Design a protein with these regions (language model features):
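N-terminal targeting leaders
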Residues: 1-38, 45-48, 52-218
Length: 218
């Protein structure tokens, strides 16, 4: 039996609110408020994401409008922001191209993609590029809400016994708030970093403290 880790398809929202290129500003704002979301993917006629339009995109448009009272000085506006200020549909308002993920991605892969592109959510697409879900930062954080007992059972059963073949109870596992403490002995010293690495890869693990030692040959 191999260790099974939750991937994007296990955590994503499948019933996705989306919009088309021609959706007007007010309709986008209405959708965001109606569904209590902060962004939604913009798709083409084949349901492939071409961009994402967010509250920030809508507010950026409003921020570039002239002050009706004439009290605020006109600010220097970059060309991209001027274009958004003049846009009236999703195609002009959206941030594109869409940064996407795939259902089989690990939590780590999705998190790194969000971090590298400074986004809070990713449309999820299948092999043909069609939208099948959305994964958010909040979805990824759910991994760390696993019960300590579930984490301990996976480490003891999958990591130590089935994967590494260690004798039962040769290593004791304590888990508190996702922090793992390992105590016991292993046959070979070079197994210690392997045990630590595999434990860190278990869903929900926040940190690993190892007090493992090589078993005495005496």
């Amino acid at each position: 039996m191999t260790m099974q880790h939750r991937c994007v398809s296990d955590l994503m929202t499948r019933d996705v609110v989306r919009t088309g290129r021609d959706t007007p500003f007010k309709e986008i704002a209405k959708l965001l408020m109606e569904y209590d979301i902060t962004a939604l993917p913009v798709v083409d006629d084949a349901d492939r994401p071409v961009g994402v339009v967010s509250e920030a995109d809508l507010l950026r448009k409003e921020a570039q409008q002239p002050d009706p009272a004439g009290l605020l000085p006109a600010a220097h506006t970059p060309h991209a922001d001027r274009a958004k200020a003049e846009a009236i549909t999703a195609e002009g308002l959206m941030t594109s191209p869409a940064v996407v993920s795939h259902p089989e991605w690990s939590v780590v892969e999705a998190a790194r993609e969000m971090e590298s592109h400074h986004v809070k959510r990713l449309p999820v697409v299948d092999d043909s590029g069609r939208l099948v879900g959305v994964i958010s930062r909040a979805d990824l954080l759910r991994v760390f809400l696993r019960r300590d007992s579930a984490i301990r059972e996976e480490i003891q059963g999958d990591v130590l016994t089935r994967t590494l073949g260690l004798a039962p109870y040769s290593v004791t596992v304590h888990v508190v708030d996702g922090r793992v403490t390992l105590k016991g002995t292993v046959e070979q010293a070079n197994l210690i970093p392997v045990v630590e690495r595999l434990c860190r890869g278990v869903d929900g693990v926040v940190d690993v403290r190892s007090d493992l030692e090589q078993k005495s040959s005496a």
